[in-house]
Each structure stands twice: as C-alpha cells, then as structure tokens.
Amino acid sequence: MRVPSLVVPTLLFGFAATASAADAQEAFPAVGHVYEAHFSADTVFKLDFTQAGQMTYTSLAGPTRGKVETVHYTAVPVQPPAFMVYWREADGTCVVHVENFGRGHVWTNIALPGGEFVHLDGELKQVR
C-alpha cells in the first residue's frame, strides 16, 4: 500500500519539498548507522537508527544523562543530504531535527510537555 504524498514547506531552505513517506524513509541515509549529536558539552546524544522509522537515543551528558528511549520517527528530505526528522517521546515531548549529513550539522526544536520550547544546534557525527 502506497502512502499518500506529503508536502512539507520549510522556510529554512526557502522552498517546499515533496516526497512520499515511504520514499523518504528508504532514502534516509542514517538507517543502520549510529550518530552523535553534540549540541554543547552538557547536551550530547547518541542516535542509533536501528531500522527505517525506528531510532534509539541515549543521553550521554547533562541532566538527562543515561536516559534511553526508542522512538518511531519520520524522515522527510528537505534538500538531500538534509532531512527533517521528527518524533514524539513517551512523556509527550515533541522533537524536530533538521539533520544535514553533508555538513555534519543538526538543528533541533523541542516542545516540552509543559509548553517550554528548546532550540539548539550542533555537530552531527557518524560513529558507526
């Protein structure tokens, strides 16, 4: 069964990207790899993209150090090798990344359950 096309507008790159959800997941280069996202010395995550649509993250530093959660994500090509990746965590936290695999950079916007927004950017490094 083919998933209907998604249209994802983005002001970040100044154009709209169109792709089917199935095509986006298949083209996503992170599947089968592990990355570290370094937002600051106190905010570092290991992102293990175990399979298309599933990722386990581990907090490696800061107040959430040691937290591990497996989430179901959606990856949408913005301008490959840049992808918008988003998911909802068990506590209701909503996370959106723009991951640029060509530049090794990641931007994140996080909406916490209490209504607070967190905006970070940093290095995205493949470790496996």
Language-model regions, residue ranges each:
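Positively charged n-region of N-terminal signal peptides that target proteins for export
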Residues: 1-4
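Sec/Tat signal peptide C-region and signal peptidase I cleavage site
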Residues: 17-23
